[in-house]
From Swiss-Prot:
Family membership noted in the UniProt record: Belongs to the PyrI family.
Any one biological process term the GO annotation gives: pyrimidine nucleotide biosynthetic process
Keyword Ligase tagged: no
Listed name of the protein: Aspartate carbamoyltransferase regulatory chain
Native organism: Pyrobaculum calidifontis (strain DSM 21063 / JCM 11548 / VA1)
Record gene name: pyrI
Entry keyword annotation includes Zinc-finger: no
Length: 151
């Protein structure tokens, strides 16, 4: 494996590393990043990794992810590591974990849930009930969802 960089370092922003191979696009989707935001985004897929065999990497220049965004990544990339970069240096590094509460990001899979009624201005809300594997319950109808089922 070559030691040269495939994608250059970023000055300020977020690097999402150790994403399971083939899941980088899903990470962008759960973050709501479409590419139209004007951010410089670097995506590297299926690179060699001692830890995972193969992995994906996402670099987002000029944006630091919120704690909620960081933890929502665990839905599609439970092995991900988040690096916050300032002046080309990593200033914070942490692993993702399922959030305690998810509000307004996903729809309840129960078609009869009040959150799916077109005339009801109710924000879908899910509470974590089990960490491994992550299991959530809808605050309104009580239906259980695995985190990966919500995306």
């Amino acid at each position: 494996m070559s030691k040269e960089l495939i994608v250059s370092k970023i000055e300020n922003g977020t690097v999402i590393d150790h994403i399971p191979a083939g899941r980088a696009l899903m990470v962008l989707r759960v973050l709501g990043i479409t590419g139209r935001e004007g951010l410089r985004i670097a995506l590297v897929m299926n690179v060699d990794s001692r830890k995972l065999g193969k992995k994906d990497i996402v670099k987002i220049e000029g944006r630091e992810l919120t704690p909620e965004e960081v933890n929502i990544i665990s839905a599609v990339a439970p092995t991900a590591t988040i690096n916050i970069v300032k002046n080309f240096e990593v200033i914070k590094k942490f692993k993702v974990s399922p959030p305690e509460v998810i509000r307004g990001r996903f729809k309840c899979r129960n078609p009869m849930c009040i959150t799916n009624a077109p005339r009801e201005p109710v924000v879908p809300t899910f509470y974590l009930v089990k960490r491994e594997p992550p299991l959530f319950v809808c605050a309104y109808c009580g239906r259980y969802h695995e985190l990966s089922d919500l995306i």
